[in-house]
Amino acid sequence: MNEPIVITEKYKESEIIGCIITNEHIYKDDNNIIPIKAMWDTGSSGTVISSDLVKKLGLSPIGKSMVKSSGSSFKSGVYNLELLLAEKQIFGLQVTESDQLNNSDMDVLIGMDVITLGDFAISTVGEEICFSFRYPSQGLIDFKEQEIEK
């Protein structure tokens, strides 16, 4: 699967809880595609998987890495993972594990390693907030340049 993708989620301002959440999938094989809840996090350099999901998927670590998170550092397992976005595009990633996600409703935190592969935008009109991601990138989104061109 190597198709362009577009993800768009629209929220009412009152529905936003400080983060963007989408329903995505982990691809194990053609007969094993697991639905997950993913939080998009521009403050995270890499994608993170919950310890609970590691156990559920039966993943084995390929190594260890030091991870910095909210003022603390810890050693984390590193795993190969295939993230399926918009049920179209598979991203083969090396992700770290965190038990901090276990107490949330999130299975995966999508970091800048994925976000920087495409175009990412959040816009607001009135009470509506729109999150969009497209892959591959179709060029820079530059609001200042758009104003100059008007």
Regions found by a protein language model. Give the residues of each.
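Pepsin/retropepsin-fold aspartyl endopeptidases
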Residues: 1-150
